[in-house]
């Protein structure tokens, strides 16, 4: 078992599409979402063998809230309940991603913790006990565990891999937190109620093949939607400002909100267009969090 410090990235999750199929009788929502992961991330380090603890640092540390409630510790305790004599340790979280932002920052951190704990205890990352701990930690943690592009269905626990190419993208967050529960409340589905558009989900076409181009994928993603965009606009109207700013960029191919917001993204045909678009946004909105990179 490793005795030296272990480190891993916690990449931002982006919902390229997000359909809310309906609300189940248990109150959870069934979803269908094409998920990709960005090249921006938090970084989590584990010092194995020390007493379980978490220290946050980095530019986003002040937004993490009470350390005792952090999903890194929740995931660790859930795995410890399933793995006798689990070797944990001291975690250090270098926080860069915005919180309550629709990009699964806390979930990605928890997934990174589970991957590090698996390495520290000679477990496979897809060990059923690790996967179960991920599911119980939070709805976005299972998809963040492998952090690979996929179609996510059910309550986020059924993952079908997708051959997604590298998509040049700009991500923007206005530094305004949006609570997921408030957005789903604004959506207003009753328990057992199907959402408008269920027929579209059931009849949806397959996604591009393994050798499809970036242009083919952008066309396919553009045909989709995010059913949480409209309720998120009711909760926090600044989401509309972000979407309008992205849609106005030169060379933009499409723009959409991720998750329950407020982070939005825009896809481009080239890295050059992506970088140019980000510079335009930084000049116009110096207070926003802006990342120029890619999704894959």
From Swiss-Prot:
InterPro entries registered for this protein in UniProt: GHMP_kinase_C_dom (IPR013750), GHMP_kinase_C_sf (IPR036554), GHMP_kinase_N_dom (IPR006204), IspE (IPR004424), Ribosomal_Su5_D2-typ_SF (IPR020568), Ribsml_uS5_D2-typ_fold_subgr (IPR014721)
Keyword Transcription regulation set for record: no
GO aspect biological process, one term: terpenoid biosynthetic process
Organism: Rhodopseudomonas palustris (strain HaA2)
Family of this protein: Belongs to the GHMP kinase family. IspE subfamily.
Residues annotated to bind ATP: 98-108
Name by which UniProt lists this protein: 4-diphosphocytidyl-2-C-methyl-D-erythritol kinase
SUPFAM superfamilies from the UniProt entry: GHMP Kinase, C-terminal domain, Ribosomal protein S5 domain 2-like
EC primary class: transferase
Catalytic activity entry: 4-CDP-2-C-methyl-D-erythritol + ATP = 4-CDP-2-C-methyl-D-erythritol 2-phosphate + ADP + H(+)
Transmembrane intervals: none
One Gene Ontology MF term: 4-(cytidine 5'-diphospho)-2-C-methyl-D-erythritol kinase activity
Record-linked Pfam families: GHMP_kinases_C, GHMP_kinases_N
Protein function: Catalyzes the phosphorylation of the position 2 hydroxy group of 4-diphosphocytidyl-2C-methyl-D-erythritol.
Coiled-coil regions listed in the entry: none
Active site location: 13, 140
């Amino acid at each position: 078992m490793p005795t030296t410090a272990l480190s891993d990235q916690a990449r931002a999750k982006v919902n390229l599409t997000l359909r809310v199929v309906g609300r189940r009788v248990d109150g959870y929502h069934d979803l269908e979402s094409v998920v990709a992961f960005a090249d921006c991330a938090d970084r989590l380090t584990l010092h194995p063998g020390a007493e379980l603890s978490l220290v946050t640092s980095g530019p986003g540390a002040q937004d993490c809230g009470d350390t005792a409630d952090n999903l890194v510790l929740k995931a660790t305790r859930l795995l410890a309940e399933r793995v006798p004599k689990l070797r944990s340790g001291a975690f250090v979280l270098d926080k860069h991603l915005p919180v309550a932002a629709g990009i699964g920052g806390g979930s990605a951190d928890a997934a990174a913790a589970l991957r590090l704990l698996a390495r520290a205890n000679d477990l496979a990352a897809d060990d059923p006990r690790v996967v179960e701990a991920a599911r119980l930690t939070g709805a976005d943690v299972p998809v963040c565990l492998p952090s690979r592009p996929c179609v996510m269905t059910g309550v986020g626990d059924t993952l079908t891999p997708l051959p997604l190419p590298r998509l040049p993208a700009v991500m923007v967050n206005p530094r305004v937190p949006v609570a997921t529960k408030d957005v789903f409340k604004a959506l207003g589905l009753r328990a057992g109620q199907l959402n408008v558009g269920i027929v579209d989900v059931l009849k949806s076409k397959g996604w591009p093949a393994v050798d499809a181009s970036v242009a083919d994928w952008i066309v396919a993603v553009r045909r989709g939607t995010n059913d949480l965009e409209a309720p998120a606009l009711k909760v926090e109207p600044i989401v509309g400002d972000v979407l309008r700013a992205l849609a106005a960029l030169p060379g933009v191919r499409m723009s959409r909100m991720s998750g329950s917001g407020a982070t939005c993204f825009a896809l481009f045909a080239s890295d050059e267009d992506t970088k140019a678009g980000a510079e335009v946004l930084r000049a116009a909105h110096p207070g926003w969090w802006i990342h120029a990179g890619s999704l894959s």
